[in-house]
Amino acid sequence: MSTYFISDIHGCYEEFRILLEKSSFNDKKDYLWIAGDLVSRGPDSLKVVKYLYSLKDRVQIVLGNHDINLIAVHAGIKDNKKENYFDEFLSSPDSVELINWLRCQSFLKVDEKRKIIMSHAGISPQWDINIAKVCALEIEDRLSHKNYALFLKEIYHNNIDFWRLDLNQLDRLRYSMNSFTRMRYCYPDGRLNMFCKKSPDFVKYPLRPWFLMPSSISKVYSIFFGHWSSLKGTHVPKPFFPLDAGCCWGEELVMLRWEDGKWFSQAYLSKKCI
């Protein structure tokens, strides 16, 4: 029994299945942890989600910003843009069932026995592990609720970038969503920056990668995340494991087997990715 970590599949189904074959992933005994962004940009979002849905308890997923966008588009809250490649998914007779399944996925996975954490963008350096767990549960509860569309209408907000215990309920949810699905850099005071996507090699003070900020969590846990394809080729210190290698941008899909630390990769094949 092995555990594999991967992220940012982005609808690149063919590359994903080849990578699973290369790694000898066994869907009857192995586990797959995915750090979000299953969909969008690549041509086969529907195939990716249907396959993961079929794995049942063999897959552990945290949602990324593109997964949230798909749910919002399906609910009629956001426009379906051409570059999403959502048409096949939205017209599928299985779309409602699959969307409801996605809505019930997590924003944070924690394995206390192995001291592993997974989220899409990362973990706010302003949080300790207990606050992170509570904040994840709060947005998971809202997204899985029957009135999730109202939640999604209110959750998008760029200015909620600093954590305080006295945040009102809505701003607390907004901050949590921004932290789990959007952040890359922080300012020295801990404020999030959700807009700069460049490699740290080309970014100067005052911006600093979130994983280089002081944090009590990184002293205890190995942290797996995606969301940041421009980190490829940049030194990221342990205990952080970036998983987004930019497959949908013409690069590659990568996967780590936890037990022996072996990495697997598959170069981009699809010609419809943007």
From Swiss-Prot:
Task: Output the Pfam families linked to this UniProt entry.
Answer: Metallophos (PF00149)
Could you list this entry's UniProt keywords, alphabetically sorted.
Answer: Hydrolase
Specify the superkingdom: Bacteria
Q: Which InterPro entries match?
A: ApaH, Calcineurin-like_PHP_ApaH, Metallo-depent_PP-like
Q: What is its EC number?
A: 3.6.1.41
> Which residues does UniProt call coiled coil?
none
What molecular function terms (GO) are annotated for this protein? bis(5'-nucleosyl)-tetraphosphatase (symmetrical) activity
The reactions it catalyses are: P(1),P(4)-bis(5'-adenosyl) tetraphosphate + H2O = 2 ADP + 2 H(+)
Question: Its biological function?
Answer: Hydrolyzes diadenosine 5',5'''-P1,P4-tetraphosphate to yield ADP.
- Membership in a protein family: Belongs to the Ap4A hydrolase family.
Family annotation (NCBIfam families): apaH, PRK00166.1
Which PANTHER family does the annotation name? CYTOCHROME-RELATED, PTHR40942
Return the protein name: Bis(5'-nucleosyl)-tetraphosphatase, symmetrical
